[in-house]
């Protein structure tokens, strides 16, 4: 779910949203008027196993929307997460996220060193400031790998070593995503930067115990006390061939898409919500 179309207070050099349908001009609708429960049922009936609140921008720019989506989502999903760059997280918001039903917070943090991370992301909190705000929230650290930054197994190890003292035991390292060749969104400054700084090979290949494997290949491993995954997106060609999409994506304008790169993948648009019974969450 992408409640924020494109607003963000940071400027990651590789920003995928700049090369996706999030970059299209579209009018945001008030999600409180939409049939969100109907969308949750639609997604779950088609195999969705977790609710992910992310965005073409920073979701916590709309904290009330995020909390409402989580509260409704816990009626449908056992696993709920939200991606954030951490700039808007406060101790009070962290507690509210926990109370609403968030399972864990995915923190987009792309280098272990504060200065190097700010150089790549255009800002962001220090490690110490973020974890002070996060409090007791379970945090899954998410790092996009890029040459010159976190680019190999040694860099991944240094990243994990820096975050483990703060209690982090879940790590996702992501390949440097670029738009697929036929995409109308290729050629953005961010896409060109990503293409020139690509890291595509799994730095953890052959290590640890494989706990699970996603249908298109990424493996979730246990390495010592940590859960680690090198994640790459499925290609649109793979999704078409296998008739399986990574996710359904509810956009800020109420459109539901099978792909964030193909505007032709619109599945439907949410209608207004029927009134929820008095006293319901």
Kindly give the residue locations of the regions a language model identified:
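Canonical radical SAM enzyme core domain
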Residues: 22-38, 59-104, 108-126, 143-158, ...
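Short Fe-S-cluster ligation motifs
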Residues: 35-56
């Amino acid at each position: 779910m992408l409640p924020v179309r494109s607003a963000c207070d940071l400027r990651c050099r590789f920003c995928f949203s700049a090369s996706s349908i999030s970059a299209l001009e579209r009018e945001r609708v008030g999600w409180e008027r939409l049939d969100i429960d109907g969308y949750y049922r639609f997604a779950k009936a088609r195999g969705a196993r977790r609710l992910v609140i992310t965005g073409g921008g920073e979701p916590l720019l709309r904290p009330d929307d995020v909390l409402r989506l989580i509260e409704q989502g816990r009626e449908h999903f056992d696993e709920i997460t939200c991606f954030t760059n951490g700039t808007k997280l406060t101790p009070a918001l962290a507690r509210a996220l926990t109370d609403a039903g968030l399972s864990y917070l995915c923190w987009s943090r792309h280098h272990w060193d504060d200065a190097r991370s700010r150089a790549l992301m255009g800002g962001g909190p220090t490690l110490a400031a973020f974890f002070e705000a996060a409090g007791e929230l379970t945090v899954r650290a998410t790092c996009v790998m890029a040459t010159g930054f976190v680019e190999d197994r040694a860099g991944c190890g240094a990243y994990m070593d820096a975050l483990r003292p703060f209690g982090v035991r879940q790590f996702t390292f992501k390949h440097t995503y670029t738009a697929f060749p036929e995409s109308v969104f290729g050629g953005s400054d961010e896409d060109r930067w990503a293409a020139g700084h690509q890291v595509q090979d799994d730095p953890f290949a052959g290590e640890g115990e494989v706990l699970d494997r996603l249908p298109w290949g990424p493996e979730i491993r246990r390495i010592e006390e940590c859960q680690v995954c090198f994640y790459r997106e499925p290609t649109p060609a793979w999704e078409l061939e296998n008739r399986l999409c990574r996710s359904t994506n509810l956009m800020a304008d109420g459109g539901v898409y099978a792909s964030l790169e193909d505007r032709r993948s619109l599945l439907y648009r949410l209608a207004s919500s029927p009134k929820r019974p008095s006293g319901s969450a």
